[in-house]
UniProtKB/Swiss-Prot annotation:
It catalyses: an alkanesulfonate + FMNH2 + O2 = an aldehyde + FMN + sulfite + H2O + 2 H(+). The gene is ssuD1. It comes from Mesorhizobium japonicum (strain LMG 29417 / CECT 9101 / MAFF 303099). CDD domains: Alkanesulfonate_monoxygenase. The lineage of its organism: Bacteria, Pseudomonadati, Pseudomonadota, Alphaproteobacteria, Hyphomicrobiales. Residues 364-390 are annotated as: Disordered. The keyword Protein transport does not apply. Its EC number is 1.14.14.5. This is Alkanesulfonate monooxygenase 1. Catalyzes the desulfonation of aliphatic sulfonates.
């Protein structure tokens, strides 16, 4: 039932507000993630031509709204995908925050709707709702939130939320409101997406599994008289050769011991997120079962919650794998790599120019303007690129 195939795609990067490292599961190779570092990553993404950046949310992260507000004036075109949290925020407060950040960024805000899938973290935030109730709250929240941002005055008495004279005095730049992104693999999540959301997100499962998931959501949306677009969240390990890429993947988990893997998998098992369960099932915590589809590697998910798979390979191979997902109807790719500053450049230089993006990316020049101390050949002339020499 694959729907429309997009001709062009959007490619976003990721701001690691929860930490960054050269290795997973160890403090070795870790680096301080502070505002100067996040500024470097954001400016790199802006310069290289990524469409935007995703900011994660939760108690393991710096607050996404505060960080995005700090980085907006330091960037020019970059969009910021920031989370609203039904159950943690009132819909009218979230609408005011959304409108303000959209205005001060001149329309560079994207909204990620996050229901939350860790019962212990939810309790720490004062949320004692079941899985089904959280999605009920999410749907009520979104119906109020969208109406308020659209300029309506809202009176609402629902099962979970009660709003009187809910309205917005200062509207957002984007009309009727910034695009809404959402990921949810349960039946309840798929229903909310089909009825309320602009772009449905999936984590990086094998293409056949992704196709089935998107078809199910697409069918629900059609029944609701709506049409969605689709995005996917993946890590990437791109190198000039396939051999180098797989060596880099092995190196990323080379400091990871079995006890750390077991501890992480125990945490994931307590969650009631269907998406997290699907991620964990791809590898079962077993190092020997990490290539789950051609060039799709589940090593990140041994210890990282959420997105746990990476595309691994040379530039042409990764571009081909991305095109496989595009042909399933996906038009938005939210990517990351460890460490995020270096990998933003590596992917941005090796792969991004090969992709059919609908936003401008940094052009590969015919020569390199560097400096007088060795980069320029013999201090006499500039090296030409391989493309211009061919």
């Amino acid at each position: 039932m694959t729907g429309d195939v997009p001709d062009r795609i959007k490619v976003l990067w990721f701001l690691p507000t929860h930490g960054d490292s050269r290795y997973l599961g160890t403090a070795e190779g870790g680096r301080s993630v502070d505002l100067p570092y996040l500024t470097q990553v954001a400016k790199a993404a802006d310069t290289l031509g990524y469409y935007g950046v995703l900011l994660p949310t939760g108690r393991s992260c710096e607050d996404s709204w505060v960080i995005a507000s700090a980085l907006v004036p330091l960037t020019e075109r970059l969009r910021f995908l920031v989370a609203v949290r039904p159950g943690l925020q009132s819909p009218t407060l979230a609408a005011r925050m959304t409108a303000t950040l959209d205005r001060i960024s001149n329309g560079r805000l994207l909204i990620n709707v996050v229901t939350g899938g860790d019962p212990l973290e939810n309790k720490g935030d004062g949320i004692f709702l079941s899985h089904a109730e959280r999605y009920e709250v999410t749907q009520e929240f979104l119906r109020i939130y969208k109406r308020v941002l659209s300029g309506e005055t809202v009176e609402h008495q629902g099962k979970h939320l009660h709003i009187e004279d809910g309205r917005l005095l200062f509207p957002p730049v984007q009309t009727p409101y910034p695009p809404l992104y959402f990921g949810g693999s349960s039946d309840a999540g798929s229903t909310v997406a089909a009825q309320e959301i602009d772009k449905y997100l999936t984590w990086g499962e094998p293409p056949a599994d992704v196709e089935r998931k998107l078809d199910a959501v697409r069918e629900l949306a059609e029944k609701a008289g709506r049409k969605l677009s689709f995005g996917i969240r993946l890590h990437v390990i791109a190198r000039e050769t396939t051999e180098e890429a797989w060596a880099a993947a092995d190196r990323l988990i080379s400091r990871l011991d079995d006890a750390t893997i077991a501890s992480a998998q125990k945490v994931f098992a307590r969650m009631d997120s269907v998406g997290q369960a699907r991620m964990s099932a791809l590898h079962g915590g077993d190092r020997a079962k990490l290539e789950i589809a051609p060039n799709l590697w589940a090593g990140v998910g041994l210890v990282r919650g959420g997105a746990g798979t990476a595309l691994v390979g040379d530039p042409d191979t990764i571009a081909e794998r991305i095109d496989e997902y595009r042909r399933l109807g996906i038009d938005t790719f939210i990517l990351s790599g460890y460490p995020h500053l270096e990998e933003a450049y590596r992917f941005g230089e090796l792969v991004l120019p090969k992709l059919p993006t609908d936003h401008p990316v940094k052009a590969t020049g015919s020569s390199v303007n560097t400096g007088p101390f060795g980069e320029t050949i013999a201090g006499d002339h500039r090296p030409k690129s391989l493309a211009s020499a061919s």
